[in-house]
Amino acid sequence: MYFYHRIRDLREDHDKTQREIAKYLNMQVTVYQRYERGEREIPIWAVIRLACYYQVSLDYLVGLTDCIKPYPMYSWI
């Protein structure tokens, strides 16, 4: 599965619109739409914010694993 499929699927699973996610990422909707279509590379800061928002690991977002659970949070971080 491609990365852009993951971000679209997560958004749809959480019943969010592209406009809502674009606002969360502080970007124009058209820019976010290009990320979801795979027409533009998404910056790492946006990937990290999406992982936090959806509470999934970065590995899941980029397709390295199918395990949707996030990494445990450590108090020393």
Each language-model region and where it sits:
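Conserved hydrophobic/aromatic packing and binding residues within compact polymer-binding modules
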Residues: 7, 21-22, 32-35, 61
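DNA major-groove recognition helix of helix-turn-helix/homeodomain DNA-binding modules
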Residues: 45-60
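Short, charged recognition helix plus adjacent turn
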Residues: 62-77
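Alpha-helical DNA-recognition elements
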Residues: 38, 49, 67
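Recognition helix of helix-turn-helix/homeodomain-like DNA-binding domains
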Residues: 26-41
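Short basic helix-loop element that most often maps to the first helix and adjoining turn
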Residues: 5-24, 49, 75-76
